[in-house]
Amino acid sequence: MMTALLRCCGKGYAFSVINMANIVTCKTKDGETVQYVDEVIGSGSMKDVYFSPDKSYVVAFYHKPQNEQARDRIDMITGRYRQNIFGQSGGEYWKDLFCWPTHVVEHGHKIGIVVPTYKSYFFFKYGSKNDDFLGIKGREKEGKWFASASNQNKFLDPRERGNTLTYLKVCLLLTRAVRRMHAAGLCHSDLSYKNVLIDPEMGHACIIDVDGLVVPGKYPPDVVGTPDFIAPEVVKTSHLSKEDPNRVLPSITTDRHALSVLIYMYLFFRHPLRGGKIHDMSDEVRDETLSMGEKALFIEHPTDKSNAVKVSQLSSFSLPWADLEKIPYTIMGPYLTPLFERAFIDGLHDATKRPTADEWESALVKTVDLIQPCQNKACEQKWYVFSGKTKPVCPYCGTPYKGKLPVLNLYSSRKEGSYRPDDHRLMVWSGQSIYAWHVNRLIAPNERTTDAQRKRVGYFVFHNDQWWLVNEGINGLMSLPDKRQIAIGEKIELTNNAQFVLSKEEGGRLVVVQLVEN
């Protein structure tokens, strides 16, 4: 017996305990044999869910008969669209980032889908505080648990909360998944913390509830989204009929808004639009519609402070995260800051200006390379993004950096012997690694990265009051200007203004060291 704690196929499940009831065997539409234990383990607004005997997948049957268009969409999602994503080069990579239906099954006048069960790290290992007083240990890590400072501080065991580095990894994976979905011409339409699972402890993420994906112009959305994540133009026109040409429905551009909100919430644990401004004191529904729609305003707008959060009205559980003076969005560094501005200032009411998932992915990759461990061992966040200042300070606990801090400025070749700045830096800390994508600009860390490219090729170490790069697998490592070859197994010292070549191939990198001392 075990408690069923899946939510991969609908909303608001009531869960029950599995008894080993009858095992039902049936065929999928494409001829595969599937089995399920004939006892409902989860029932939501759309489906009833059953475990397979080995619990490696679930079978979810829709409550209501599906019309022809809905059946066609399910067939396409489990068929062609799934093949286009998982059947391509690097397709295996996406199995960890999507809980994607694999088959359609019809049995006893019911239609359903077969969906993989969640990975073990998407279930709470420790649960809530005070010996799991909420009883959530073993339940799935729905993204909403982690999206507000108040939720985390009030309820979650500190071991479940993660830190700045793991949340950057979570955001990177979510962004990568959305990028792939959009590249296939699909949009989620309900991208929110209710439809993602995240594991902040290790930095995992997965998009769920994909059986309702929207194909613009072919399959319309079943829902307009989840409050907090619906784009302002969708909220603003929600009173209009779906047939009205002025009605804005979910699309890839509205997904971009939802993705930006998710990233902001997972990095700052607050909502970018929920501030102190009230638009209608007498009508709460109208006030909400204006705040999230026509009158939506970034709480950190640089010139219009009317929606700024009123710190005096905040619960202590929300602090310091809700205090915009202490933790502004700019602490995330030079790559994410302009994207937040495009998402919530320039693009909030102009969808064409919103950052794409590709742009978020690129900025997050560069930001992860700017991460620096806090020297205060008691710092809850443990890491922070290097600000570019000569006297860096952890924005979370206020601890200044002490000692020598090497920053590697990356340049790459467009033609042999000619290097241009890449607007990309790599912070150095003891144990920090160099990978193939640092050696060569033409290699990107994504689903196409080979196993060989995922292996580190060098690492940094602080020894005898000096910083060193140890060469583990860089064949072309060469110091300048003496052009001395640094063989595998040897090391090169990182001194101020030192230069060395990582690769002379096309796209190969040149490094210029900047040494900050405090």
Each model region followed by its residue ranges:
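Juxta-kinase regulatory segment immediately upstream of eukaryotic protein kinase catalytic domains
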Residues: 15-39
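Activation segment/activation loop of eukaryotic-type protein kinase catalytic domains
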Residues: 194-239
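ATP-binding glycine-rich loop module of kinase domains
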Residues: 37-38, 45-104, 109-112, 119-161
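Catalytic-loop of the protein kinase fold
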Residues: 178, 182-200
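Conserved C-lobe activation region of Hanks-type protein kinase-like domains
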Residues: 263-337
